[in-house]
Amino acid sequence: MVELRILKNRDDWLKNRTRIGGSDAAAIVGMNPYMSNVELWEIKTGITTQRDISEEPYVKYGTEAEQHLRELFKLDFPEYEMHYAENNMWTNDKYPFSHASLDGWLIDQDGRMGIWECKTTNIIKSMQKEKWRDRIPDNYYIQLLHYFMVTEFEFAILKAQLKSEFNGDVYIQTKHYKIERADVEEDIKYLADAESKFWEQVQKKTRPALLLPEI
């Protein structure tokens, strides 16, 4: 059974983030460029504590931009019904090791439920922009698979704002990516198995073999 809880405040939400979240998932399968699966395991087992990045400028920008990007999406895509609640947390008793907190959730014209995710990124190098060319970067794709797994929704839409600066001018490019659950069922199953194995390693305090992302 899928359950949605709305926690009373951010502190309560943080206290309840005791399982595997969407931003953790890519590290488990070695696709997070910022954290390895071993580093995540050390955090989940209490060996180390997770660094608080909430005051980093890029994180604050993304957090403050989110509500505006959500409203823009509603204007640009009125065929979708947008829903959002602050401090939302989804759980699924099929996957007791995981939870999901969504940027939004959608209902399409056929009544299907969907995930809405937004990303803001500052493009400094051409290689960063290349990762968004006709595809979603691996770590964000894995995050969406995690959300599919927990929510059992039928589709996902990711809105990406790519920001770059040149000669004092700011350039903004917006991209939208849609994924149908039916097209990624095998990947969802693969991730669910990987998360289950990882959580067993956390509970037994068995250090996993190091997985590194491809450069």
Task: Give residue ranges: language-model regions.
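Short glycine-rich, polar/acidic loop-and-turn segments at beta strand-coil junctions
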Residues: 45-47, 67, 71, 86-88, ...
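Generic detection of long, well-ordered alpha-helical segments
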Residues: 31, 59-67, 137, 185-192
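Charged, glycine-rich intrinsically disordered N-terminal tails and low-complexity linkers that flank
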Residues: 1-64
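Acidic-basic catalytic patches of nuclease active cores, encompassing PD-(D/E)XK
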Residues: 59-83
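Non-catalytic C-terminal interaction segments of nucleic acid-processing enzymes
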Residues: 193-215
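Generic structural marker for isolated residues within well-ordered, non-membrane alpha-helices
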Residues: 38, 70, 144
